């Protein structure tokens, strides 16, 4: 069976991930006119820039959908977001600022839940708005086929007939008007935005040029913290975790994770927390640039890692970071539910996250400027008295440390012999200044 259909399968049911925007509206109407039977599926991901979710399926029916469904994905999305925080599943960082993989998390949820809904309706052909140059076309492909082994893919944006007729937004708008729908194009922004309740992605157009900065972006989850005219008073916030799960903000306990994430977004968003500018490697190995918002994810991540460093030992923390980066890349690649990802998730959640219980108090200021004010946990292995510089009882004595240092003589002697061995092999040069062979100064090389 052919998995990817290059031309419209007339007479057959086609499920389309319908956002209600110009692209998917024109595509749905065009497919109906060309003889297909379109079914529209809209994911409610708690997008901060969407005001009326219930209106989206109604518009789909007006444009010719045989049926239209709104699928509430928020609970599952937040569950996956919390799992990512527990595992540190983030691999893209620049200057200490993290991209929280909010788009890959959204695709993992959308790609599985929408295709599952289609399968319930007997719809085994799926189309979405992802382009052939991006990451999402592969993410949706993988998640769709994982959910429904019989799935076929039809994307109007890969169909030359569709492209020839409606290849641009102007043509799509004219097509909608000609068909009796007063569809006006929204005002073109200097960049494209995609969002869910975990975060927002701003990319493309002017942001493809590296001399266009974050200052051209209008945040949809936060504030312009770089604009000194925007007043942002400092604010204290306390985050509580129980066994790796965020349960309370500022003393308020949440039984609903969705409400908890919305409140975390509001708190972090008031300061522009979690906004970053990243150059990343797409799945196809080409570099792209995005500006990201994730105020709630950032707030929870900061508090979680503060507890992590106070509770776990050095090797466990190192494994958390190493495995987390691996898992973050798998998530980015659309492999969040692959066996290698599940193996990493299980270990990190079972042995690391389960011990993260306690409270962290922060002072948030502008952007990613914050201070940690207090850290409290019954599980802390940080004990101030162990290494106090003040006189008093200690768990070990000066003689104990002398013995420990004496044992180091073994590997120090081995290292010294190795250095002179490298010098004999010509890999290092002798140094009269230190008495040890050294790497030759590159400034002197060739003189």
From Swiss-Prot:
Single annotated GO MF: ATP binding
Catalytic reactions on record: L-citrulline + L-aspartate + ATP = 2-(N(omega)-L-arginino)succinate + AMP + diphosphate + H(+)
Matches recorded under CDD domains: ASS
GO biological process: one example: L-arginine biosynthetic process
GO cellular component terms given for this protein: cytoplasm
Pathway the protein takes part in: Amino-acid biosynthesis; L-arginine biosynthesis; L-arginine from L-ornithine and carbamoyl phosphate: step 2/3
Compartments reported by the entry: Cytoplasm
Family assignment from sequence similarity: Belongs to the argininosuccinate synthase family. Type 2 subfamily.
NCBIfam families: argG, PRK05370.1
Protein name: Argininosuccinate synthase
Species the sequence originates in: Salmonella dublin (strain CT_02021853)
Encoding gene per record: argG
